[in-house]
Design a protein with these regions (language model features):
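N-terminal maturation segment of proteins
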Residues: 1-556
């Protein structure tokens, strides 16, 4: 490990983190944690809660205290009956192993066996009361995902040990789903969810602990009411101009004045063939890297990110693309940026959409991890490199804001004479429809995703506070923005609420925070590229620590 504990307390925190999330330890570079899963039986979870409390009382820094608060809050969610957590951990562990090392039968066999043990432990010691319908839906979705993983493993391996372990895992998943999921769940999409909610309701049952989760799981300072108000303020600020933008593009394209119709029309007209997507991204990043490093955020000289086509067996988990940080606790960190081309997932692969994906995933998430792991523009502690839900929120905020930073740069570039690197970039884009059209479409997609992320804030607050149920919120969002009910559902609920109350808000809330402090730094004479390099090198501290460090930099 390149990051070492500076005290016995920090060493104890590292040990606790490894026990709670062995898969994260493995992908962080600790090979001895391959094939391991945490044990979520209730007596063990309760003992972990006590251990976290004891360590918190001895914590030496705010980073340590808030990390422990986030870890403790996640354990409490499992104790509150959020039954989607064990299968979610298992899915994350499987795709982490598959992305990092491919089909290593011994590790995957161990992981399948550990998954069986984890699911049975939670089922036998967990909540006796029936989970709320919303939690049962989230659990069924994750169980369906695990069954898809199992099906892939059976097809991809010849190992009899792995096949046997997978068969046992399938039985355990089915038993778990029968106890904690929705009876007869088919995982067939939005229409099925509407039917379930109309029949059984869609309550998540989180109103009694939502405020606590905001404060501890994600280190928010806002109350649920304040969070909703912030989301509405963002939406009210930008939705009118976005609607005008949709009208103009729809008129130009000769299609219905709806954002999704515009998006699908662009995609249909300009989507790259699957065989060209990775090549386009690799060519694109050669130019974008130079522009980003010069104008937005510096890239450390040992930055390594591999661009790959999402394997078909992972495309269900990454329907458009994604990023993963690997060996981030070692001296040789690297990242993987995946682009999905599997036609079953109908990925959007127009040049502008792929540019947006590249900016968000690679020059947001991947660069944040790499610059932090290399201590490039700042020196994070070991505690601040241990990923948690609170720390991951920081990465979401950085990546969300990076999209609009790149948009601002493109608009500024159009107002002056292009540099040599910019001319090369424009020449490259000429092969894919030309810079003018791609810039216009990048603007549209960036603004579309901003609307989605603002809606996530409002939805997160209302649904988890029981102010609106899921279907009521979807109906409201459809009327307010014109986005389809299906899109609102998919962008607000299955992945984001499954990650816990508060996660859906992280993109916009943390992104707005970065933007606000950045403006203060610029007013005080700091350069944007220096501010962003510092912010992008701070590791994964909880929000309050991250913001405090940024404000100190901005005013110093």
């Amino acid at each position: 490990m390149s990051f070492k504990p500076k005290s016995t307390i920090e060493a104890s925190i590292l040990d606790l983190w490894k026990e709670l999330d062995p898969s994260a330890a493995f992908i962080g570079g600790l090979k001895e944690y391959a094939g391991r899963m945490p044990l979520p039986d209730f007596p063990h979870l309760e003992s972990m809660t006590r251990k976290i409390g004891e360590l918190s009382s001895k914590s030496e820094t705010r980073s340590q205290k808030r990390l422990l608060a986030s870890l403790g809050a996640n354990v409490k969610l499992a104790l509150m009956g959020e039954a989607q957590i064990p299968p979610d951990i298992a899915i994350s562990a499987f795709f982490a192993h598959l992305i990092k090392e491919g089909m290593v039968a011994t590790h995957l066999t161990s992981l399948a066996n550990e998954t069986v043990r984890a699911l049975r432990a939670y089922a036998s010691t967990g909540p006796s009361r029936s989970c709320p319908t919303g939690i049962r839906i989230l659990t069924s979705i994750r169980c369906a995902g695990l069954l898809e993983v199992a099906d892939m493993l059976k097809k991809q391996t010849r190992s009899k040990q792995l096949q046997s372990a997978v068969q046992s895992m399938v039985a355990a998943v089915n038993d778990y789903s029968q106890k904690f999921g929705v009876t007869g769940f088919k995982n067939s999409g939005f229409d099925e969810i509407v039917e379930i909610c109309s029949r059984e309701g869609c309550d998540l049952g989180r109103s009694s602990y939502y405020a606590d989760a905001l404060a501890n799981l994600y280190d928010y300072s806002e109350s649920p009411t304040e969070l909703e108000a912030r989301g509405m303020s963002m939406l009210d600020r930008e939705l009118p101009s976005f609607k005008r933008e949709v009208e103009e593009l729809a008129s130009k394209l000769g299609v219905q004045t709806k954002a999704e119709v515009v998006a699908h029309t662009i995609s249909k007209k300009k989507a790259l063939k699957a065989s060209r997507v990775v090549g386009y991204i690799k060519g694109l990043k050669q130019h974008v890297a130079k522009l980003v490093s010069t104008n937005i955020v510096k890239i450390n000289p040992r930055y390594v990110t591999r661009v790959v086509e999402t394997p078909t067996y992972l495309s269900g988990m990454f329907p458009s693309g994604g990023a993963m940080f690997l060996d981030f606790l070692t001296k040789k960190p690297f990242q993987v940026f995946m682009a999905t081309t599997d036609p079953r997932r109908a990925p959007e692969t127009s040049p502008a959409e792929l540019l947006n994906l590249l900016v968000h995933e690679e020059y947001g998430h991947c660069l944040h991890s790499s610059n932090s792991a290399m201590s490039f523009g700042a020196k994070p502690t070991l505690t601040e490199m241990l990923q948690s839900q609170a720390g991951n929120a920081v990465s979401e905020g950085i990546s969300f804001h990076r999209e609009v930073e790149f948009l601002n740069y493109l608009n500024e570039m159009k107002q002056r004479k292009a540099t040599t690197s910019e001319r090369a970039f424009l020449k490259f884009l000429a092969k894919y429809g030309g810079a003018d059209e791609i810039f216009e479409e990048y603007t549209f997609f960036t603004h579309l995703w901003r609307m989605v992320r603002f809606l996530r804030v409002v939805g997160d607050a209302r649904i988890n506070s029981d102010k609106q149920n899921l279907m009521e919120f979807i109906d409201w969002a459809n009327r307010e923005t014109g986005l389809s009910k299906s899109m609102v559902y998919h962008q607000v609920f299955p992945a984001h609420q499954g990650n816990g109350p508060g996660y859906a808000s992280t993109y916009a809330i943390l992104g707005e925070s970065v933007a606000t402090i950045q403006q203060e730094a610029l007013r005080n004479g700091k350069k944007l590229v220096d501010f962003d390099t510092y912010a992008c090198s701070l590791g994964f501290p909880p929000r309050s620590v991250f913001e405090e460090k940024l404000r100190t930099y901005a005013t110093g």
